[in-house]
Amino acid sequence: EGATIILGFAGVGLIGPIIGNTIIEQIDDLKEIGFVASDMLPPISTFYDGKLKHPFRLYYSPNYNLILGISEVPFQISSAYNDLAKTICNWALSDDVKAKEIVVFQGIPQKGMINEFPVYYASEDSQIKQFEEDGIEKVEKGIIVGPEATIINEALTNKLKPLALFTPVYQIPTPEGAASIIEV
């Protein structure tokens, strides 16, 4: 009850999976609790250190009351994200989970060299004060696209507090941007 759900999707800069896999390495009691299976996922499997894994996995840490979802591949049909968002948010609000917030990440594509990787946020009013105290800048306006957008829209419709964290990224995997978000 009261868990935070962190979802890392494979988007620009791959910061979602990079952040998710880094969290797995850093939190000792984070254990795989399940996976998401869908005909809308491309025919891809993943493996780490020779161990096969589902491309969309769920983990839980009792010490941090944290649920982590990592999708290392995009869905084949973008309209499937709406169903995914409804399923995740309904599960998050179920009596088994009763989550309080959902956190997503999105890279801001940049051209050329990126010298700094500042972190920006977009959230509901109740979270703004904490970010201001921590010195994290808000995004004044913009759009969020992809699975992160459908998750946020569904969370806003329900009783979940959505939070989006952004950082500049290259069009290729950008671990520097992911590291900036992890520090927050």
PLM segments and residue spans:
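N-terminal catalytic or cofactor-binding beta/alpha core of small enzyme domains
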Residues: 1-98, 157
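Short beta-strand segments
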Residues: 7-9, 69-70, 104-106, 166-168
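Gly/Ser/Thr-rich loops at beta-strand to alpha-helix junctions
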Residues: 9-15, 75, 106-112, 170-173
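Residue-level detector of short coil/turn "hinge" positions at structural boundaries
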Residues: 30-31, 100-101, 138, 162
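Catalytic cores of processing enzymes, dominated by hydrolases/peptidases
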Residues: 54, 109-184
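Internal, conserved structured core segments that host functional sites
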Residues: 76-128
